[in-house]
């Protein structure tokens, strides 16, 4: 008899990598990130005042989320846009999901602050108390403060047929007051804005502290106003009062390629922003339904837009407590260090008397110190890591020395965000006054920094700086400086290419990297990039730089697919990428293909991550962590194993569609072996973190790593601070 044939095994169905189930929604992923920020406020290992800071950061982040993301989703719904992202969730569904996810989180935040953090503060003699809990003497002091300081500033606004509902500014704190006319018995509504010219939390003087030894004792300003409402409405009965706050859309609607004058167009849009549509209403719990309904109707809001919360509103203002001189309740102070590579410059500088004003230092000083710095860069590439390394002693010094050095002919820089009293801008003004060619790209569309940047643009233009506002249709996000210097009869170009803004204030809080180099190819690339930004050049390729929106997407995909080829050929294949967010579908799909091919992938993503790790057959070999702590992780680092010949890159871009397609970005290769080793070690420290790292689970939640029993804590920030001190001390 013929033998029975064994049944043929059916080939597995190919996995559809475009299936929405393999992608997280970016709005919900962002909310997960902010939830990790809030966890720092709940974590008893976080110093007490730092816990208030994280409460404030969470609330401030959330304000921006509503002003931009929720406002954008609402606009899509109103415009009938049904387009969905890779996760397949339409805008209306996203708004519902945001509400469903967020309401319990903010409810718990307010409960925790009101019931638990306030008690913890009181235990440490920091009393944020209620007005009616004060002694008569303390109340009298605050009533006098109200009459002398606050009352003259207040403008109570009635709401009735003769007084239409007043304009409410975005994010302002207000009191809705229900008053009753005792003669007519008629109830009326009034609004009192809590002025922001005064401290939100009003401190009582030391002599009124009871008992003595109290660190701080104070009351929220709105409670002082509320207990003095009779002074604002004499002859009326105060029936009830409740705090409320609104959030308006802050998205600029600007067609940059159609604007004749971008600066004027943006100024006009900023003015319009004040009147953006209301996207959220926050009210104190217990507000009468009629009052709540009136506010909703006047703001044209639905139930989904209203958040009824316990206790204080606007917890952003808790930032103020970080100003208390109580170091025992804060993180140990960190002093950014001068990196060993820059200590030579410090030593050269110390040979001069620098006690006088910087403007009086002579040419011999500037020449000597600048020569030291530029010769240092000529000896080899240098990388600096902020805030471990001092921004003032490295990047700021580089720009300041270039501004004064007689041999420097030109300085070109991109400014995305800088500080209000920017020494960078001051140095650029000085460079122009010293007769150098100075070109500055000021990105006017840097969200919420538009007014600041307009101010600097005008100031720079006044002294003859060539100021440009970017490329039409694109936002310039690259962090680059080009210094052109005359040396021994030849021109040499020096560059700084970084991951963070040229902002001294955020440089002490944000973790960022910067490369100093005088490699000819990088200098040539940066010259051509600035020509694109300031002129009409259309550069299609670059020697070394990955530039968006020209080469970065294609080159990134090539690097991923090269690792796939190595894995398919049985060779080692590895990708490590650190950035703020990954949301681009094409890049995520390529990473899924890499995982399927056998490439080991570690992603260090602080914020949004639409990639779903750990899915069998799709992303088994992809691991994602997020590091949250005292510094904001902001650097972008990319490592590709390349079969034992690794390539490293740093730069300004995340793997998001906006960075790859709608922004001017620059990523530079790191080719110096010593710097490559340094980056590798720093990535390994982050991947080994068991204190600040959170692991992304396949269901979209995050699990915080904890040290095993008997294992020492390895927090990225504390490890790198200790390592920096050791490196600096070892170099002396």
Swiss-Prot record:
Asked if the Swiss-Prot or TrEMBL record annotates the protein with the keyword Magnesium, the reply is: yes
Mention one GO biological process in which this protein takes part, according to its record: polyphosphate biosynthetic process
Keywords, ordered alphabetically: ATP-binding, Kinase, Magnesium, Metal-binding, Nucleotide-binding, Phosphoprotein, Repeat, Transferase
Q: Which GO terms describe its cellular component?
A: polyphosphate kinase complex
Catalysed reaction, written as an equation: [phosphate](n) + ATP = [phosphate](n+1) + ADP
Which Enzyme Commission numbers does its entry carry?
2.7.4.1
Q: Where does Mg(2+) bind?
A: 417, 447
How does the record describe the protein's post-translational processing?
An intermediate of this reaction is the autophosphorylated ppk in which a phosphate is covalently linked to a histidine residue through a N-P bond.
Similarity remark: Belongs to the polyphosphate kinase 1 (PPK1) family.
Give the function comment from the record.
Catalyzes the reversible transfer of the terminal phosphate of ATP to form a long-chain polyphosphate (polyP).
Q: Which PANTHER family match?
A: POLYPHOSPHATE KINASE
Name of the protein in its database record: Polyphosphate kinase
The scientific name of the source species is Thermosynechococcus vestitus (strain NIES-2133 / IAM M-273 / BP-1)
